[in-house]
Regions:
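Bacterial N-terminal signal peptides
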Residues: 5-17
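Structural detector of well-ordered beta-strand residues that form the stable sheet scaffold
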Residues: 106-110, 211, 241
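Catalytic beta-strand/loop cores that center a nucleophilic Ser/Cys/Thr
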Residues: 50, 56-58, 78, 146-236
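Short, solvent-exposed loop/turn segments at secondary-structure junctions
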Residues: 34-35, 89, 116-118, 188, ...
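A glycine-rich, often tryptophan-bearing local segment used as a flexible ligand/cofactor-contacting loop or short
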Residues: 89-181
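Helical hinge/lid and interdomain linker segments adjacent to catalytic or ligand-binding clefts
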Residues: 26-119
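Sec/Tat signal peptide C-region and signal peptidase I cleavage site
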Residues: 18-22
């Protein structure tokens, strides 16, 4: 006969074993060059992931701009997801090949803010991020601009320069795929803090899901279009989450940025989101910061 206290002990051991089995998701942040303050923003990205208790985070930093890049050869395959906070010199050919293979074979990738300005000459990278801006991109060379109208994606083939934003102001973000795991359970419309609202991004725009948009206000030098802010892209077996938000640490304090980033990294890594929507999420009219 088994004593009751032994049974309780056994059950508790099982619970402990189950929790221990949920191994943390391994994340690699890449940085080292950017026209943004990457030395300030990478520690914020790292902390935001670590504070969920679901991730362990390493950082791979490239040599500085203009230096020999041949030493930059991270072992992407050791991670479930790579987050780019990089916008700079081309990577060595071997690293480019390794990264393409990594995502094509099912590795996760997250393009954060100006990472979608990077590598205009790298075709596979443009396919991963779907759309990008600046870097002398023109719509006629890179692919259509992506706008949202009439409840669906509209590919805008008019020629033009890709990548623009007005002054940093608060703006509303509207979910367009509310059942997507990254945003499921979050408010349909929420007020983001002062940030750059990217407009006129262009690219191959293949295998693209627009998760959320924002209206680019002509009164703030905008396009008058609903522009993609959060996107999900398939590249081979890999999942890509593309967030245009988070210009600086102040913009990254928005709970809307924080939560969509944390959930987007988990989704890119695993295809699932286990994080619950928080209680302090912004509403349609009020920002919320942490
Ligand atoms: Zn910016």
């Amino acid at each position: 006969m088994v004593h009751r206290s032994c049974l309780i002990w056994f059950s508790l051991s099982l619970v402990t074993a189950t929790v221990a089995a949920a191994a943390p998701i391994k994340v690699l942040i890449v940085d080292g060059q950017n026209n943004h303050a990457w030395k300030e923003t990478t520690p914020v990205l790292k902390t935001l992931l670590e504070e969920t208790g679901r991730f362990t985070v390493d950082v791979a930093t490239t040599p500085p701009k203009g230096a020999d890049m041949s030493s930059f050869q991270p072992n992407f395959a050791a991670y479930a997801v790579v987050v780019s906070n990089y916008n700079g010199d081309p990577w060595p050919a071997e690293t480019v090949r390794a990264f393409e293979e990594y995502v094509r074979n099912g590795g996760g990738f997250v393009s954060y803010h100006a990472a979608d300005n990077a590598f205009p000459e790298w075709k596979a990278y443009q396919q991963m991020i779907a759309v990008g801006g600046w870097g002398n991109r023109k719509e006629e060379d890179f692919g259509p601009m992506v706008r949202w109208s009439g409840g669906k994606i509209r590919l805008d083939a008019n020629p033009g320069i890709c990548g623009h934003h007005g002054s940093r102001l608060p703006f509303q973000v509207t979910l367009r795929d509310p059942d997507h795991p990254i945003v499921k359970g979050l408010p349909a419309v929420w007020m983001h803090v002062e940030d750059e609202l990217y407009d006129s991004l262009c690219g191959p725009a293949a295998s693209l899901t627009v998760i959320a948009t924002a209206h680019s206000d002509p009164a703030n030098k905008g396009t008058g279009e609903d522009e993609p802010m959060l996107m999900a892209i398939r590249y081979g077996k890999g999942r890509v989450f593309h967030t245009t938000l988070g210009h600086d640490p102040a913009a990254m304090r928005c709970v809307g940025f924080i939560v969509t980033f944390q959930r987007g990294v988990e989704w890119a890594a695993s295809g699932k989101v286990t994080q619950k929507p928080p209680k302090d999420f912004p509403t349609a009219t009020e920002t919320r910061v942490r």
